[in-house]
């Protein structure tokens, strides 16, 4: 007869994994960064929308300030997907310009320089799915005087300005001469 140890050991390992893995009950992940866009501003944050399979569901975005019990909830209907859902997606690119679409929810009226925890709860029909709670922080406010103006007036800008000024002078001078010669005939 086989020893019951492997069965007991496996069951205990599974129980420990279920208990110790944080956030194991979350159904989907949300992201805050895309590499193309900084979603953080001084008084607002951009959060990716819930996944496409939740289109049409009622989403509740929960924003909780770190070290505070105050919770702000915002509700909206998950918009339909048009292709892959990314925070920023290229819609059209050609002839020197690129059109992008921003697929994000903007959380507004936040305090500058503060850490927040953000999560979704989406109800679609009889099913309810939730996201993991992700931390995001707003930028602190900076005085306008403290923002560095490196390269405010570069040498290239000065040269271009001088060349354009000389060209405009010559153009106006040529126009005056052409009008004067045309009026004499």
Curated annotation (Swiss-Prot):
Subcellular location: Cell membrane
Ranges facing Lumenal side: 86-156
Any one Gene Ontology cellular component term annotated for this protein: endoplasmic reticulum
Keywords: Cell membrane, Cleavage on pair of basic residues, Glycoprotein, Membrane, Signal, Transmembrane, Transmembrane helix
Residues carrying covalently attached carbohydrate according to the record: 29, 58, 67
Record flagged with keyword Transmembrane: yes
Membrane topology: Single-pass type I membrane protein
Propeptide: 27-85
Record protein name field: Uroplakin-2
InterPro entries, alphabetized: Uroplakin-2
Its biological purpose: Component of the asymmetric unit membrane (AUM); a highly specialized biomembrane elaborated by terminally differentiated urothelial cells. May play an important role in regulating the assembly of the AUM.
Gene for this chain: UPK2
Tissue: Bladder epithelium.
Transmembrane segments: 157-177
Signal peptide (residue range): 1-26
Organism name: Bos taurus
GO molecular function, one term: structural molecule activity
Disulfide bonding pattern of the chain: none
Record has Membrane as a keyword: yes
Family: Belongs to the uroplakin-2 family.
